[in-house]
Amino acid sequence: MSGMNQVVATCWTCLLLSAFLCEPVLSKGGRGGSRGSSRGSHSRSPKAGGYRGGGPHNGGTRGSRYRGRSSPVRVASAAAAGAAVALTADKWYASAYRRSKADGSDEELDYYNRTNYFDAQMSSSTQNGSSLSQLVSIIIATFSPKYGLLMDSIL
């Protein structure tokens, strides 16, 4: 993996973590939202969302109130997922490229040796560890294959 891909992956990871940890909705308890208390009590305002009104006039206000708003966590998650898919596709492509070439040049073997660890991590049939430890191991190995192998031997 080139140094530029590592920088991009690091930036997206930091963006996702900061958006996830700093999201005010996630740290607020209950169903309160921005109005009312955080314990889920109903607001007394008639325009608060139509929780009590079951008639035809208030029927569509609850669902349409939240449409059109995009959370920073959703945006960051989508961006991080795109970056993860791109990095994973790069590793799978490198593995397939190495297997299709039979001339055995040193450059291709060296590139395959760096991606062989990721192939083993991505295959769930040979691993019995917890998914969290595998995720941590993959993240560490993405940024430094040397430390990833060390972490894999520890776990």
Swiss-Prot record:
Residues bearing a lipid moiety (GPI-anchor amidated serine): 125
List glycan-bearing residues.
113, 128
Provide the residue ranges of the propeptide in this protein. Answer: 126-155
Per UniProt, the keywords (alphabetical) are: Amyloid, Cell membrane, Glycoprotein, GPI-anchor, Lipoprotein, Membrane, Prion, Signal
Q: Domain of life here?
A: Eukaryota
Membrane topology qualifier: Lipid-anchor; GPI-anchor
Query: Where in the cell does this protein reside?
Result: Cell membrane
List the GO cellular component terms.
plasma membrane; side of membrane
* Predominant place of localization: membrane
Q: Region (Disordered) spans which residues?
A: 29-71
* The UniProt record lists the keyword Membrane: yes
Q: Where is the signal peptide?
A: 1-27
Q: Which family does it belong to?
A: Belongs to the SPRN family.
Instruction: Tell me the protein's name.
Output: Shadow of prion protein
Q: What is the lineage of its organism?
A: Eukaryota, Metazoa, Chordata, Craniata, Vertebrata
